[in-house]
From Swiss-Prot:
Protein name: UPF0759 protein YunF
Pfam family, one: DUF72
Source organism per UniProt: Bacillus subtilis (strain 168)
InterPro entries: DUF72, UPF0759_sf
Source organism superkingdom: Bacteria
Membership in a protein family: Belongs to the UPF0759 family.
Length: 282
């Protein structure tokens, strides 16, 4: 099965009924898509009340891709707010309890930063991370091209498969070492993740000193031909694993939801079990 969704649920104005309150947006979102990426967990390990609330607000078959906390992936500047890395991982795993108990956890996404390159100590850290996470399904996304350079390409994929990492396949601007190529290879027989980041080369490189780079980094709208090409790629990936989870992250200009809907039409997919959709009668 191919599951289409977006990163976050709070900034997709084209899918909400008029005047939808922020606390009602997840419910509205889940009437359109069966999966979502939770990125609040990247900035802080979420308290139980938040996770329980989000689980309760979504349909029984809804699935979350929970982004790993930034201290776990090396994005955090300075000291982590825990006594040890083990304590940090334990706290994060406890936060996943509502998703695990409700069968709503698709996977945890470990997205590593551009400076996390292919070298022995980083390979060892990936192995350690996966050991800490135990049987929890985890996806791995790189932002450094060295992992897929000719000397390491097959070794990286073999390592991911041997260690039980789900491959997070990326569509993103192809610029230097801070981006990775699109590698259409599943490393887990059950799940593959695909994330669409757009192809805005200028935005990806932090123009103008990087002051407002987050506002333009994902400013991109995929055209019909690009989506049709990806229809073929997604079908190819589905031949390699049971389920493919697709996330549109190109939302600096509000394009993610529309592109997600276009992909649903191209694939001729209609999901059952979505939340009831509110009718706009006037």
């Amino acid at each position: 099965m191919i599951y289409i969704g977006l990163t976050g649920w709070g900034d997709h104005d084209s899918i909400y009924p008029p005047k939808t309150a922020s606390q009602k947006k997840l419910q509205a979102y889940s009437s359109h898509f069966p999966i979502v990426e939770l990125d609040a967990s990247f900035y802080a390990i979420q308290p139980a009340r938040n996770n329980e609330k989000w689980v309760k607000e979504t349909p029984e078959t809804f699935q979350f891709i929970v982004k790993a906390y930034q201290g776990m992936t090396g994005h955090q500047r300075g000291e982590i707010p825990f006594d040890s890395k083990e304590e940090m991982f334990d706290a994060f795993k406890v936060s996943l309890t509502p998703y695990l108990h409700s069968n709503k956890l698709a996977m945890v996404l470990f997205q590593f930063p551009p400076w996390f390159d292919c070298k022995k100590e980083n390979v060892a850290y990936l192995r350690w991370c996966k050991h800490q996470m135990g049987d929890i399904p985890c996806a791995l996304e790189f932002r450094n091209r060295s992992w897929f350079s000719p000397p390491f390409y097959e070794q990286t994929l073999s390592f991911m498969k041997a260690e039980g990492w789900i491959h997070s396949v990326c569509d993103e601007p192809q610029i230097g070492e801070g981006s990775v190529p699109t590698v259409l290879r599943a490393t887990d027989e059950n799940k593959t993740l695909v994330r669409f980041h757009g192809r805005n080369k200028q935005g990806w490189m932090k123009p103008d000193g990087g002051k407002n780079w987050r506002e333009v980094r994902y400013l991109y709208r995929y055209n019909q031909q690009e989506l049709e090409d990806w229809k073929k790629h997604l079908n190819e990936l589905q031949q390699q694993c049971k389920d493919v989870f697709v996330l549109f992250n190109n939302n600096s200009g509000g394009d993610a939801a529309d592109n997600g809907k276009q992909m649903l039409e191209l694939l001729d997919i209609e999901y059952s079990g979505l939340a009831p959709r509110q009718l706009d009668l006037f």
